[in-house]
Amino acid sequence: MENLPTTYDGPVHIAVIGGTGLSKLEGYVPVAALNPTTPWGSPSSPLMIFEHNGHAVAFLARHGLYHQLAPHEVPARANIAALRSIGVRTIIAFSAVGSLREEIKPMDFVIPDQIIDRTKGIRPFTFYEGGVVGHVGFADPFDAGLAQVVEKCASAMKGDGVVLHNKGTIICMEGPAFSTRAESHMYRSWGGSVINMSALPEAKLAREAELAYQMICMATDYDCWRDEAGEDVDVAMVMKYMAANGENAKHLVGAVLDELLKQDNSDLVLAKKWQGSAQGAVKFMTKPEGRDPEAMKRVEFLFPGFWEQN
């Protein structure tokens, strides 16, 4: 990585945020390592630019290059802002999850369509504060168009019995400790499908930044609700299944990228659906007399030229 250029002039509209089990893009050649700074600090890792068949994709390691950042320490605002600043408009995020449903087996994949927030306010979770207020819609936290692309690519996975579930509700907990048994049963009663520590505020910030965002989840365990000896989740169990099914994770993400890079998906990749959604929410809230200059600069970083139009 030391010998890679630190600038890249070509368009980069798609990014992959890798979590536990996905640390690189197979078949892609690294061509640059960018180190942008944002008003919210530096991202978790350099933004690695990879090329494949003439197209560029950015890759960011959510927990750092050496997995040194706990879930509540991930600089999610810097991550999302840095990706947008280089031109990214679509994010495919990957996460290992615990299953809260019998039918979602370890090594199965899930395309979630909903989230329940069980974080505790420790993580900074909005771009719009400190003198500029914006209330952004989040009823459907993931991008339905991206979800359809992921589902279409299910055939890229290899092996008997590998299943891709086309919807589900993520419980996003604070961590870093796993759930108690009582909590796990409670989450099941709420209709939770899987549980992780990474979906928020990442998905919410992507929406505030007008990015198309979809998480791909791979189940590694049954959390601790099954009440059977030896089945309670621990790190060794998570890593065991990630190692066993890591190739399928890479195959699936690779197939999704190939599909997104087709011309037919250009509007989807450019997040045309979300353009103006957050800016409108900001524009009509805080009156000019109450706007803090520093907060205005932060919004300008996300949307250059914003205040000239508003």
Swiss-Prot record:
The record marks 179, 235 as: Important for substrate specificity. One of its GO terms (molecular function) is S-methyl-5-thioadenosine phosphorylase activity. One of its GO terms (cellular component) is nucleus. Its EC number is 2.4.2.28. Pathway: Amino-acid biosynthesis; L-methionine biosynthesis via salvage pathway; S-methyl-5-thio-alpha-D-ribose 1-phosphate from S-methyl-5'-thioadenosine (phosphorylase route): step 1/1. It is an enzyme of class 2 (transferase). InterPro entries: MTAP, Nucleoside_phosphorylase_d, Nucleoside_phosphorylase_sf, Purine_phosphorylase-2_CS. It catalyses: S-methyl-5'-thioadenosine + phosphate = 5-(methylsulfanyl)-alpha-D-ribose 1-phosphate + adenine. PANTHER family: S-METHYL-5'-THIOADENOSINE PHOSPHORYLASE (PTHR42679:SF2). HAMAP family: MTAP (MF_01963). This is S-methyl-5'-thioadenosine phosphorylase. It comes from Neurospora crassa (strain ATCC 24698 / 74-OR23-1A / CBS 708.71 / DSM 1257 / FGSC 987).
